[in-house]
């Protein structure tokens, strides 16, 4: 199955370069249908597209738990010492996180 998601330019470029291999999202209805082996078509703000394969889903109750368990350099942080779960509150409220949980989507560039 192919899923479509939007990305800000910086994480888009990091995925394109193969540096970021875990995308962090709310585990809402849209992400709950993801499965290993599915494809994600990411679109940047400039309309660029990149296709990746879902390798594994890492599901947690909160970004706090996710940040303690996953390698943050693979989640898009250049300086992991500055990484904090509160960074994700600019995208997802604490109420949304409590309602749905969160997911680290482990991905690999897709080369057809």
Named regions from a protein language model:
Residues 1-34:
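Compositionally biased, charged N-terminal/linker segments
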Residues 4, 53, 104-106:
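Beta-strand secondary-structure signal
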Residues 14, 66-112:
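Contiguous surface segments at macromolecular interaction interfaces
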Residues 49-59:
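Short beta-strand-centered aromatic/proline hotspots
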Residues 58-61, 111:
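A generic structural motif
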């Amino acid at each position: 199955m192919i899923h479509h998601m939007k990305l800000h330019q910086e994480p888009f470029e990091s995925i394109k370069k193969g540096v970021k291999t875990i995308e962090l999202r709310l585990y809402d209805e849209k992400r709950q249908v993801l499965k290993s082996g599915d494809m994600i078509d990411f679109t940047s703000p400039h309309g660029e597209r990149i296709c990746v394969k879902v390798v594994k889903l890492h599901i947690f109750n909160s970004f706090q738990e996710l940040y303690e368990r996953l390698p943050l350099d693979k989640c898009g942080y250049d300086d992991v010492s500055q990484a904090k779960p509160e960074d994700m509150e600019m995208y997802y409220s604490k109420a949304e996180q409590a309602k749905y949980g969160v997911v680290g989507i482990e991905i690999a560039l897709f080369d057809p």
